């Protein structure tokens, strides 16, 4: 393998990664396709209207559950990221010009799909003077304006912890402000060279101080130890993280970081217990859990824990329900 799919020459790291064959998944890495009525209706609507979601385009295994709950995820900022993380499927390169109409189109897609809760994520845009802060903030504003009954979770890059850029984003008041740390300090620089562990924690702390519900994610299987996961959870909680999701790393291609270990459901259950003991109001852990999985319900848990009443238009999120990809659910089958 000498070139990436987008035609650029492979980085030395990618050449080294590609020398390790793609790993065979263990038996517990699987999902069941349960196509309920809400999913079927949404699937047909998305096809008819030509809408685009991360759920479909990334082949997310949880699409059946999330769409049944009328939840979906959108990617903004284009398909080229200015940073490269060794686990991420998104290409690294020179992004296209900023599309100022994108926030409106995303809001219209949310409306057309009748979503109850939407997650918006995007690429890092270090090529822009504001790092893309306006784009992220405006997308939240447009969704809220056109869909006052829909919750918005905003998953952001770190914006280099720039106070002005963070203020722009925080001022859009998403229901949840997410910034994913993804891995533990010892291997952080190797996995996420353009980010800094302490800077990511700082972003979360600032969001919490601004009164936002905060969220982060850890990906296991990239070389960390269970003990290091516990320490990272402690760091995240002390930084002010309300919601934590924990998942198994699945290698997107040979040029990405090899899978170092397959984490059994039993270990995910242990990490859930640890996170709950540390005081996280919302916890979801399992091999196929993703950061936007059951996002609305986790938001409802966090607001209840903080004594914040759920807005009437989002009261449905407090309803109890199962989560098929949660580790405890896998073990009970």
UniProtKB/Swiss-Prot annotation:
Signal peptide residues on this chain, from the entry's feature table: none
The keyword Iron-sulfur appears for this protein: yes
Cofactor(s) this protein cannot do without: [4Fe-4S] cluster
Database matches in Gene3D superfamilies: Aldolase class I (3.20.20.70)
Positions annotated to bind [4Fe-4S] cluster 2: 81, 85, 88
SMART domains the UniProt entry points to: Elp3
InterPro entries: Aldolase_TIM, Elp3/MiaA/NifB-like_rSAM, LIAS_N, Lipoyl_synth, rSAM
Cofactor note: Binds 2 [4Fe-4S] clusters per subunit. One cluster is coordinated with 3 cysteines and an exchangeable S-adenosyl-L-methionine.
Domain of life: Bacteria
Occurrences of domain Radical SAM core (ranges): 67-281
UniProt keyword terms in alphabetical order: 4Fe-4S, Cytoplasm, Iron, Iron-sulfur, Metal-binding, S-adenosyl-L-methionine, Transferase
Coiled coil spans: none
Organism: Saccharopolyspora erythraea (strain ATCC 11635 / DSM 40517 / JCM 4748 / NBRC 13426 / NCIMB 8594 / NRRL 2338)
EC number of the protein: 2.8.1.8
HAMAP family membership: Lipoyl_synth
Binding site for [4Fe-4S] cluster 1: 55, 60, 66, 292
Any GO CC annotation of this UniProt entry: cytoplasm
Substrates-to-products reaction catalysed: [[Fe-S] cluster scaffold protein carrying a second [4Fe-4S](2+) cluster] + N(6)-octanoyl-L-lysyl-[protein] + 2 oxidized [2Fe-2S]-[ferredoxin] + 2 S-adenosyl-L-methionine + 4 H(+) = [[Fe-S] cluster scaffold protein] + N(6)-[(R)-dihydrolipoyl]-L-lysyl-[protein] + 4 Fe(3+) + 2 hydrogen sulfide + 2 5'-deoxyadenosine + 2 L-methionine + 2 reduced [2Fe-2S]-[ferredoxin]
Underlying gene: lipA
Listed name of the protein: Lipoyl synthase
Pathway in which the depicted protein is active: Protein modification; protein lipoylation via endogenous pathway; protein N(6)-(lipoyl)lysine from octanoyl-[acyl-carrier-protein]: step 2/2
Family statement: Belongs to the radical SAM superfamily. Lipoyl synthase family.
């Amino acid at each position: 393998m000498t070139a990436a799919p987008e035609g650029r020459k492979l980085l030395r790291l990618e050449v080294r990664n590609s020398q390790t064959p793609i790993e065979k998944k263990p038996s517990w890495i699987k999902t069941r396709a349960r196509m309920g009525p809400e999913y079927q209706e949404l699937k047909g609507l998305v096809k008819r209207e030509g809408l685009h979601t991360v759920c479909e385009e990334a082949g997310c295994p949880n699409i059946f559950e999330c769409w049944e709950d009328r939840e979906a995820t959108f990617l903004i900022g284009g398909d080229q990221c200015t940073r490269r993380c060794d686990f991420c499927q998104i290409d690294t390169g020179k992004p296209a010009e900023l599309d100022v109409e994108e926030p409106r189109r995303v809001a219209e897609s949310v409306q057309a799909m009748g979503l109850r809760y939407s997650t918006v994520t995007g690429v890092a845009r270090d090529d822009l003077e504001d790092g893309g802060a306006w784009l992220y903030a405006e997308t939240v504003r447009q969704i809220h304006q056109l869909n006052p009954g829909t919750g918005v979770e905003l998953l952001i890059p770190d914006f280099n912890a720039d106070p002005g850029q963070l203020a722009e984003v925080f001022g859009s008041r998403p229901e949840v402000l997410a910034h994913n740390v993804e891995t533990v300090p010892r291997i952080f620089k190797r996995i996420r060279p353009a980010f800094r562990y302490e800077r990511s924690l700082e972003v979360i702390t600032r969001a919490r101080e601004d009164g936002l519900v905060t969220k982060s994610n850890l990906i296991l299987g990239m070389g960390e130890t269970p003990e290091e996961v516990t320490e990272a959870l402690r760091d995240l909680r002390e930084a002010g993280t309300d919601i934590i999701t924990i998942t198994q790393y699945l290698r997107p291609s040979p040029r990405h970081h090899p899978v170092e270990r397959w984490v059994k459901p039993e270990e995910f259950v242990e990490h859930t217990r640890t996170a709950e003991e540390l005081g996280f109001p919302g916890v979801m852990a399992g091999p196929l859990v993703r950061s936007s999985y059951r996002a609305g319900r986790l938001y409802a848990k966090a607001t209840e824990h903080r004594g914040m009443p759920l807005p009437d238009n989002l009261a449905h999120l407090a309803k109890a329900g199962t989560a098929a990809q949660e580790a405890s659910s896998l073990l009970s089958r």
